[in-house]
Amino acid sequence: MIDRIASGFHPFVLPFLAGMFFVFGYCIFGVIKILLQLPRADRLQFYKSLVTPETAVKNVKDIFLNCLLHVKLWKRNPMLGFMHSSIAFGWFMLIVLGHVEVILFVPERIKFFYYPIFFNYFVAEADSTVQGSLLFFLMDFFLLVVLVGIALAVVKRFRSLIFGMRRTTRPSLLDLVGQYALWAIFPLRWLAEGFTAHISGGSFMTIPLNWIARQFLGNEFNMLPTWWAYSIALSVFMFVLPFTRYMHIPAEMLLIPMRNAGLHIRHARKGFARAEIFSCPSCGVCIDACPMSVKKSNLKDCTVYLNRHIRRGHEKRVDEISDKCLLCGKCQAVCQVGVEGPTLRIAQRATRRYNIEQDYSRIDVQPLTEAAMGSKVLYFAGCMTQLTPRIPRAMESVLKKAGVNYVWMDRDGGLCCGRPMLTAGKLGEAKQIIRKNEQIIKDTRAHTLILSCPICYKIFKEHYNLPGVRVIHHSQYLDELVKLGKLSPIKGAASVVWHDPCELGRGSGIYEAPRSLIGRCAELREAGNNSAESI
């Protein structure tokens, strides 16, 4: 391969360069803004993680698997996964192989940012080599992979049910501009490289196209408009990218190392939350998953639209959508990016200011009796369990049968775990309640706290500071008692379906203990939607 243009430049590359410099500048500014919004401790933690070998390897692995191969979508629907990964990974390989071509054949041109993108215009094939033929084949192969992905994307735009999606998001005008520009990029690249294949070489995709084109368009000047069109399509896509759903492409590459560094949402709009909001791909997978979406009027309140309105600064709609959520976490479970919809909503609620201040610091809770102070096991039923008296009565019976020395912490009433205040965004008030409960538990010197309510379990596990105290759900504790031989359930003929509670399953990752326990007592059958996708 040799240069056929001495200057190594043609004006048609200018639209591409303008778009590339714009999107690079925008992303660099965005990254700096997000990092500066992080608390100093989080920022230092993030920087440290980047130079930690284990975390660095995990970052590369996760970016490759999630940003290029879209493994989560493959697991959800193979056709949907193939569509996304063929475009992302195929485009990535075209860029990589383009750089390989420049380095191998015209290394002095690698300094030109645009050369690997428009390589076939600027070079001529002097003689055929094995290296060149292999690269031509690979370039055509990955171009075909991307074109297949684009074709599937066009089909999905009008027939999403084929890809397992009953509903998709409504695209904005700029989303449509970006989408059509993306769809145009690779057919135009195929045409452009096809027009020059008799000069720069090609393979099974470009050479046949070149032969057909030369039958009707013999003038070689006809090839230039296609290269202009290819460059302009790239430029349009990059100029609109920051203002469309496609911003998730660069944003997710920042979100992954931030998440692997152990960062969390601390503000509704800043820092880590901002990275999550811009990483939302607006694919609409969360719409079908949301239990509220069974009513058509609720479709506009799903997490994907919350992220969209936050990005656009539509404060009224953000407040409305933040309230219209059961916080079940199913949207987060199915999201390919892992956007924390419930946490974003709670953080948004926390930004509100109320005219009435609530102060729980003066609550005086009656301490447990002296007899309870020596008990090693505490049982906390919780507000919701108290509304179903059979549950705590059954727990009492079973614990006595197993000979467990326990105390029912909230038998005669007690403080709530703090969940209602937390989900309302009243974090200060919730902390006051939590501190009171912590003191009561610490005073008993108990080493185990059993909870029946999945909501209470998650709150105690994640928000309480109880060193030396094992927090456990009653299904786990009873399963342990059975395995230790302290309980001997008799298996009956009943057939039982277990519903995974949102807070116990998706929220806390406890799936096996309840099933193990039920399986010893009855025939266990699985529901259609279970485990992480339980309704």
Task: Name the predicted role of every residue range.
Residues I249-F272, S297-K316, R393, P514-G519:
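Short, charged low-complexity linear segments at domain edges
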